[in-house]
Amino acid sequence: MAKTKTEKKAKSAINEVVTRECTINLNRRLHKVGYKKRAPRAVKIVRKFAEKEMGTNDVRIDTRLNKALWHRGIRNPPFRIRVRLSRRRNDDEDSPNKLYTLVTYVPVSTFKELQTENVESTED
């Protein structure tokens, strides 16, 4: 016999506003990509990573992150990059998405022993 459903479904965690710091290894994702496509592909990789990690289709990349990806030119984006992913509420009423993800650059001196961590969000 089938079980009766007595449990109430939990709210989806994707609807919560949250901020995380992550390291993205661009080197393994840019392997075998032509020189003139590396920096543009790095931007697309960051966008795809944020979309998967935070579960939102609307991803906005900060200008400082864009400059960090492009600062060595089109051929040589950094091997790794530390980013802060902030899932935020969309103020635009006619937008199809209720939430969006803002991706900002976090400068670090070394990537050793860094892990993904939740950050107490401070609204700007």
Swiss-Prot record:
Keywords tagged on the record: Ribonucleoprotein, Ribosomal protein
Q: Which GO terms describe its molecular function?
A: structural constituent of ribosome
**A biological process term (GO) from this entry:** cytoplasmic translation
User: What's any one GO cellular component for it?
Assistant: cytosolic large ribosomal subunit
Q: Which Pfam families match?
A: Ribosomal_L31e (PF01198)
NCBIfam families for the chain: PRK01192.1-1
Record family assignment: Belongs to the eukaryotic ribosomal protein eL31 family.
What the entry lists under HAMAP family is as follows: Ribosomal_eL31
Protein name as it appears in the record: Large ribosomal subunit protein eL31
State the taxonomy lineage: Eukaryota, Metazoa, Ecdysozoa, Arthropoda, Hexapoda
Its gene name is RpL31
